[in-house]
UniProtKB/Swiss-Prot annotation:
InterPro entries named among the record's database cross-references: Amino_oxidase (IPR002937), FAD/NAD-bd_sf (IPR036188), Flavin_monoamine_oxidase (IPR050281)
Name of the encoding gene: anon-37Cs
GO CC, any one term: cytoplasm
This protein's name: Protein anon-37Cs
Organism: Drosophila melanogaster (Fruit fly)
Tissue expression notes: Low levels seen in adult heads, thorax, abdomen and ovaries, high levels in testes.
Length: 504
């Protein structure tokens, strides 16, 4: 995954930004105007949360707002790469259709001139020992699993005083409920085995969204923050980063500074707030909005903030989990439709041919689905779930290509499947500026940790504020949470000055 992305500025406009500027004109007063001109605001991180916060502040007249980004690329977990004959997303890909004001969908909808498409239903073929599993069985199990993902059985278990041990973590819950469903719904041992392997594939798909093993995930993640992806989301064929480009259209180089890794955040006492970068530059601030990824906070919060953050916030950072969703793309010289006729979900011995002997640890056991990228004739996406993420990121290209080609040949029962020309994969967990890709509720955390992490610090004014996908229960862990949380903290600063003017 490259860190540098060439900004392709387009002649687009955002209707909400223009509207916000007009609203700001109506609210002008001498004191408020002075605050807009003089207040220094530093946003740490140019991911979607940081960019959304800065854009919201700038559109309301707070011109002395600056974003400091450690890498040479803005956009955070939105990272589009040109690959083969298409554009591939190494991070966030789908946009949920959500009409709320601060959603990613609203931003996408207001980005003029950008093509958008709805994901079309794609019934993957489940393969067991080279044979296709009955689609009716797949559809039934998929429906039942979606009910489990919405936590329907959790409240029922609590109310009836059932086996609460199965609620220790998400995997225990899934296994217990799926075993019960299989026992009731399928009588023949062969059908039970097939059903169990389908459920296992769906468990891995769930894990692929969070980027972790489900044994680590608190059952509260299901009840408070449903994870199952929307069935008909939007995607941008030319890359989701076009939306990010639109966000920065009215920012100059002084307001968006890349290649600025932060080494220290001095957040109190009030007159001395500042952000120091590793290159020696220092930025004084009246307000600091921290949008650093949870993985970075976990590793560096103890040395980054001066003074040290309060204990409850440090505990929240420690308790929340941080996964690593993995993206793998393969590009072929000739159209892949010659040998791949649809999305495939391999099960059982297709994933591990040595299962009857001594099971070997192999990353291909975690493959969920192999599918053609919608806008391409030459690029495959390999969906991986469950675990082994760091191991896969470090695997040499040749070894990875050898193993995935072997799996593809077993799936289509043909040794004529060619080797890919190119490989593209993400490396979120090993990137020092991310150290992972998506937060989740670990078995040691709860919704309260999200609220503690999001709480601003400061005696009289919000001096240090926190935004990012780990700071919002609504859409927790998604780009919607990143965007809305950035706007939330920007609005908190705006409201502080509006209140000061009215009280004064």
């Amino acid at each position: 995954m490259q860190c540098f992305k060439l900004a392709s500025r387009r002649s687009l406009y955002n209707a909400r930004v223009l509207q916000a500027d007009n609203i700001g004109d109506k609210q002008r007063s001498p004191d408020l105007e002075a605050a807009r001109q003089n207040t220094q605001i530093v946003v740490v991180g140019a991911g979607l949360a940081g960019l959304s916060a800065a854009q919201h502040l700038l559109s309301h007249g707070f011109r002395r707002t600056v974003i400091l980004e450690a890498t040479d690329r803005y956009g955070g977990r939105i990272n589009t790469q040109r690959f083969g004959d298409t554009y591939c997303e190494l991070g966030a890909k789908w946009v949920k259709i959500d009409g709320s004001q601060d959603s990613m969908y609203e931003l996408l909808r207001n980005t003029e001139g950008l093509g958008k498409q709805i994901k079309q239903p794609d019934r993957a073929t489940y393969l067991q020992d080279g044979s296709r599993i009955n689609p009716a069985m797949v559809e039934l199990i998929d429906t039942l699993f979606r009910q489990l993902c919405r936590g329907f059985k959790v409240s029922e278990r609590v109310k009836t005083g059932g086996d609460l041990h199965s609620l220790d973590n998400v995997m225990n819950y899934f296994r217990t409920e799926s075993d019960r469903i299989i026992g009731v719904s399928f009588q023949h041992p062969k059908d039970q085995l097939a059903a169990r392997e389908i459920f296992q594939s769906l468990f891995k798909e769930f894990g692929s969204i969070l980027g972790c093993c489900l044994e680590y995930v608190n059952i509260e993640h299901i009840t408070k923050c449903p994870v199952q992806q929307e069935q008909r989301p939007l995607y941008v064929p030319t890359g989701l980063d076009n939306v990010v480009d639109d966000l920065i259209q009215n920012m100059d180089k002084a307001q968006l500074q890349t290649g600025k890794p932060v080494g220290q955040i001095q957040w109190t006492p009030a007159p001395m707030k500042s952000v120091g970068c590793l290159d020696g530059s220092l930025y004084n601030a009246d307000h600091i909005i921290c949008t650093l990824p949870l993985g970075v906070l976990k590793s560096f919060a103890g040395v980054l903030f001066r003074p040290t953050l309060p204990l409850d916030k440090m505990l929240a950072i420690r308790n929340l989990g941080f996964g690593n969703p993995l993206k793998i793309y393969l590009s072929y010289k000739k159209p892949i439709g010659r040998w791949l006729k649809g999305s495939l979900r391999p099960l059982g011995t297709l994933l591990n041919p040595s299962v009857e002997q001594q099971p070997e640890r192999n990353w291909t056991q975690q493959v969920v689905e192999i599918s053609q990228v919608p806008s391409s004739q030459h690029v495959l996406e390999v969906h991986v779930g469950g675990g082994y993420y760091e191991e896969i990121e470090k695997l040499p290209d040749e070894e990875l290509l050898e193993q995935i080609t072997g799996l593809l040949r077993r799936c289509v029962s043909s040794h004529l499947v060619p080797y890919p020309q190119e490989l593209l994969r993400s490396n979120w967990s090993t990137s020092a500026c991310y150290l992972g890709g998506r937060p989740y509720f670990s078995t040691n955390s709860s919704a309260r940790d999200v609220q503690r992490l999001a709480a601003p610090l400061g005696e009289k004014s919000p001096g240090l504020l926190f935004a990012g996908d780990a700071t919002s229960l609504r859409g927790f862990g998604t780009i919607d949470a990143a965007r809305s949380s950035g706007i939330r903290e920007a609005q908190r600063i705006i409201d502080y000055y509006l209140k000061s003017v009215h009280c004064g």
